[in-house]
C-alpha cells in the first residue's frame, strides 16, 4: 500500500507499520528488525547510493526511550570517519513539534557484516590485516571522542563488497542483568572486567574485543566460548593465566577479589601454540590486546603502529574525533524536553556534500 502524504513524501506499509519517506528514496525493502527499530534498504535517487533507513520503534513512548533516541541521533551526527557509521540524512514527516512522533535515520548500506562473512569463508591473512586495521582506525576515532563501544562483536562490524568496514552501534550498548545469564554469543567478545563488573572500565574493553575477533578470524572459530559468564572467565584464564596479586588488589569489589583468589591456578599459554601457522607479527598484536589487566593493554593508536598492519597503513587516515559532550544526553529531562531537543537536532542536520556512487556498495 502506498499513498500520498506530506508534499515531497510518500507512504508505504512495512512490517505492519506506515513509513513516511521523502521521494528521493525508492525501492524500500526491509532488511532487519530489532528491539529498538526496523531497517530498510533503499536507493537514493539524488546520489545513486544504496542506503539503510532506520525507523525507531515508538521513540517517544517514555522518557527513557526518548533519551536513547536522542543519544543515538547525536552520536551518529558526531561521527565523520570512513570506518564508523555516520548519518547520510535524518528526516521526519511530522511538520511541527506537537505532531512529532517518528523520525528516520539514513546511513550507508553496507550489505553484510563480519559475522556473516566468517560463516561463508575462511579469511586470508591479507583480509584479516585490512579488516582489523580498519577496526582500529575506527576505534581510535571513537575513543578520541571519549566514547567506549562496550559491545564490539562480528555482527556489528558492517562490510561492503570492497571489503570496507564500518563500526555500528557504538556507545549505545549498556550491560543489563539479562546479558549476564544464559548462552549469549556477545559474551565471547567481552572483556573480563565487563563480564564480572570488576572495576570501572575504560576504552581498552574494546581492544580486548578486537583481540577476540582477530583471533577468531585467524583461527576460524571463537577463541573464548564460555557457556555462562563464569565459564567464560575460566576459558579466558586458561589462556591469560590466573590474575597476579597486583591485579587482584586493583579490583574494587571485595566479592570480586575473594572470587578471583579462590579460582584454580592457570599458567599463561603461549598464543603461538594456540594459533599455529599464524604470522608472528599477528601474534604480537594479540599479545598486546589479550591481557587480563586493562591498564596493560595496547591502545588503538598503539596497535595501528604494529608491523602487521604496515602494508595497509596510511597514518593520515588515522584521525581522531572531536570530544563528544556526554552531559547533554546524560541530563535529567522530561519526555517533552527530549522531543524538543531531538526535533532541533533533526532541523539543524547538515548533510555532507553529495557524491554520486561510482561503484557498488552492497555485498
From Swiss-Prot:
**UniProt free text on domains:** The TXY motif contains the threonine and tyrosine residues whose phosphorylation activates the MAP kinases.
- What's the source species for this entry? Danio rerio (Zebrafish)
Span(s) of short sequence motif TXY? 181-183
Question: What is known about its processing and modification?
Answer: Dually phosphorylated on Thr-181 and Tyr-183, which activates the enzyme.
User: Mind telling me which SMART domains this protein's record contains?
Assistant: S_TKc
Question: Which biological process terms from the Gene Ontology are attached to this UniProt entry?
Answer: intracellular signal transduction
Q: Does the keyword Kinase apply?
A: yes
Span-the-membrane segments of this chain are none
What is this protein's record name? Mitogen-activated protein kinase 12
